[in-house]
């Protein structure tokens, strides 16, 4: 059995096989996931796991180069945004890089998810709790 954080086989595989600039989307329970996408459904019940718990676990194993968020999160979910940005700042320090954050419309965000190597659905039930993580290289 693995000793590292993530023990979900699908999620572990998705992270392990990411190449430079490939993306992984983490989303709330309501984001539409295209049928053609690699859906990694972690949602168990409302709020379990939370978006932030999912983000913390994924970023413990993934080197993040940049992130993409829907601009609507600024107005509709400032609490999650504040925690998310604080986490990305701490992660950047730990990784020794900057993690630029790009804000796009929710419609554009949904289109960008089509290119993700995986879409990880959490049990989060708050608006716009979604992020596209762009994979970097740790060297």
Swiss-Prot record:
Catalytic activity: beta-D-ribopyranose = beta-D-ribofuranose
Molecular functions per Gene Ontology: D-ribose pyranase activity; intramolecular lyase activity; monosaccharide binding
InterPro entries named among the record's database cross-references: D-ribose_pyranase, RbsD-like_sf, RbsD_FucU
Chief subcellular location: cytoplasm
Pathway given in the UniProt record: Carbohydrate metabolism; D-ribose degradation; D-ribose 5-phosphate from beta-D-ribopyranose: step 1/2
Record has Lipoprotein as a keyword: no
Entry's EC annotation: 5.4.99.62
Top-level taxon of origin: Bacteria
Record's keyword annotation contains Cytoplasm: yes
Ranges annotated as spanning the membrane: none
Keyword annotations from UniProtKB, A to Z: Carbohydrate metabolism, Cytoplasm, Isomerase
List of residues binding substrate: 28, 106, 128-130
Catalytic residues identified in the record: 20
One Gene Ontology cellular component annotation held by this UniProt entry: cytosol
Subcellular location: Cytoplasm
Family statement drawn from the similarity comment of this UniProt entry: Belongs to the RbsD / FucU family. RbsD subfamily.
Role description: Catalyzes the interconversion of beta-pyran and beta-furan forms of D-ribose.
SUBUNIT field: Homodecamer.
Protein name per its UniProtKB record: D-ribose pyranase
């Amino acid at each position: 059995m693995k000793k590292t954080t993530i023990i979900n086989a699908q999620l572990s595989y998705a992270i392990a096989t990411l190449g430079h600039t490939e993306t992984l989307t983490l989303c709330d329970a309501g984001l539409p996931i295209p049928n053609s996408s690699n859906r990694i459904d972690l949602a168990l019940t409302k709020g379990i796991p939370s978006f932030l718990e999912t983000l913390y676990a994924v970023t413990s194993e993934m080197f993040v180069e940049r992130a993409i968020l829907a601009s609507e999160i600024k107005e509709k979910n400032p609490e999650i945004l504040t925690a998310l940005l604080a986490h990305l700042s701490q992660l950047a320090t730990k990784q020794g890089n900057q993690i630029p954050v790009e804000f796009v419309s929710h419609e554009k965000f949904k289109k960008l998810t089509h290119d993700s190597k995986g879409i990880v659905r959490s049990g989060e039930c708050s608006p716009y709790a979604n992020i596209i993580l762009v994979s970097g290289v740790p060297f």
